A protein has these predicted regions:
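C-terminal cap/loop subdomain of S1 sulfatases and analogous C-terminal strand-loop tails that border
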Residues: 1-96, 151
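Long, internal low-complexity/basic segments
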Residues: 75-95, 100-152
Length: 152
């Protein structure tokens, strides 16, 4: 992705999107992102909505996933992991900006920092252009037009 392979010419960015972890409406949490090789910019399109971790991460039943509870139980011995989990559960801002060279773990949101406003605006504009070009015009996954299969 950003390794030693030759750079593809005439491409300055990688774009991505996420709409939902699962079909359950409460798991819809769309975001769009752009990466220029160093800075990773994210827009959380429904940031005002309460963010809920996907059920298969939080609930042990059905999936046998014990990592959520284990992280809570290890609060004193693994405070970094515990704080990250709590940060995830507290919701996300509309904009996030990370310096992947200096913060590959994406721990420090730099969105709005004065020294990076120009970079943030560059990425924001490029992301907006990409969304227009790909006809990605809605923020709520329920409003995305999908093909309907007609019963015969």
């Amino acid at each position: 992705f950003t390794g030693s392979k030759e750079k593809i010419t005439n491409r300055n960015y990688v774009f991505g999107e996420h709409n939902s972890h699962g079909p359950n409406r409460k798991e819809h949490y769309p975001s769009r992102m752009i990466f220029d090789g160093r800075y990773y910019y994210i827009q959380n399109l429904m940031h005002e909505k309460e963010y809920e971790l996907p059920a298969d991460l939080k609930e042990e039943k059905g999936w046998g996933n014990k990592s959520y509870q284990a992280t809570l139980d290890a609060k004193d011995t693994h405070p970094t992991e515990y704080n990250l989990l709590k940060q995830l559960e507290s919701g996300r801002p509309f904009e996030e900006l990370y310096d992947m060279k200096n913060d590959p773990g994406q721990l420090y949101n730099l969105a709005g920092k004065e020294h990076l406003i120009e970079k943030q605006n560059e990425l924001k504009k490029a992301l907006e252009n990409w969304r227009e070009q790909t006809n990605d015009l809605v923020n709520d996954p329920l409003e995305i037009k999908t093909r309907q299969i007609k019963k015969q």
